[in-house]
């Protein structure tokens, strides 16, 4: 235990919390341009073709972002909005694309959890 005198001379160092989403630079979302849209396979024990895209952000970072939902309209040079949130079974994927924003369309025929997939309220 440090004495009062020692603490007066040299205060305790603050612990620095490391961000899980450094490319967002303390912003809720960031805009970027797709440089590559492709599928990748998850870690064991899961098996699928997960849709992901490589995105060059407005602040210069290049990140990999997951495209949620069934089907998408993204291609190279599409402008997308990125939010934080990793995909547990895809190593290196720490961001999600926001559906229904900018060039990324919402999911077709989506009835439940619509707000997460950029879908307007259906008529009646």
From Swiss-Prot:
GO terms for cellular component: small ribosomal subunit. Keywords: Methylation, Ribonucleoprotein, Ribosomal protein, RNA-binding, rRNA-binding, tRNA-binding. PROSITE patterns: RIBOSOMAL_S12. Disulfide bonds: none annotated. It holds the Pfam family Ribosom_S12_S23. CDD domains: Ribosomal_S12. The modification 3-methylthioaspartic acid is found at residue 89. GO terms for biological process: translation. This is Small ribosomal subunit protein uS12. It comes from Vibrio cholerae serotype O1 (strain ATCC 39541 / Classical Ogawa 395 / O395).
